[in-house]
Curated annotation (Swiss-Prot):
Domain R3H positions: 140-208
Protein name: RNA-binding protein KhpB
Family the UniProt entry places it in: Belongs to the KhpB RNA-binding protein family.
Entry function: A probable RNA chaperone. Forms a complex with KhpA which binds to cellular RNA and controls its expression. Plays a role in peptidoglycan (PG) homeostasis and cell length regulation.
Notes concerning its domains: Has an N-terminal Jag-N domain and 2 RNA-binding domains (KH and R3H).
Top-level taxonomy: Bacteria, Bacillati, Bacillota, Bacilli, Bacillales
Gene Ontology cellular component annotations, sorted alphabetically: cytoplasm
Gene3D superfamilies the record matches: 3.30.300.20, probable RNA-binding protein from clostridium symbiosum atcc 14940 (3.30.30.80), R3H-like domain (3.30.1370.50)
Amino acid sequence: MRNVTAAGRNVDEAVQSGLQELGLTKDKVEITVIEEGNKGFLGIFGKKPAIVKLVEKIDPIQQAKLYLQTIAEAIAGKSDVTVQESKKTVRYHITGEKAALLIGKRGQTLNALETLTQLALNRYPGQYKNVTVDAENYRLKRKETLSQLAIKLADQVLKTKKSIQLEPMPSSERKIIHDTLSGYANHQIKTYSMGEGENRHLVISHKR
């Protein structure tokens, strides 16, 4: 967190001097007036400069980005992280020559990075956005794969009338399957979750 103490003939001038030194705009800093300054008698005697302290505001989303980038580069070398923010979510997308190393088996490494980044963001008060971490557009490809799998398994359930239990997967992936099968085959299919923690999984069954 950068900070600077600056002086000027008045508070505004001191603030501008500090902003220029930090290379920031006024909305990016916290300003404390240490001395308001004094023009002095006839502008000469007793004259005192205004003194202010500027402290760079912490941007939780950018701090989480730096945290993620540090981990990504420790695993996959030089990496870039871009951020897309909406009202309820923050999406971090990692690119780099070895970004595929960050995915892991069925996205397990990516899911771990997502959890760590979510925890890093949650450290800051008032930050309640859902975090998504992606690399090599894995999330989109995975969504397409899961949707196709859901349809295939649902058709099997319709044919055999026997429930199918899927392997454990994160809530975001369970939701993809649930949404895909919502209303499928005239609402003959239902999905629900079972298990706890890492063993929580989805069941696809026929409505009797």
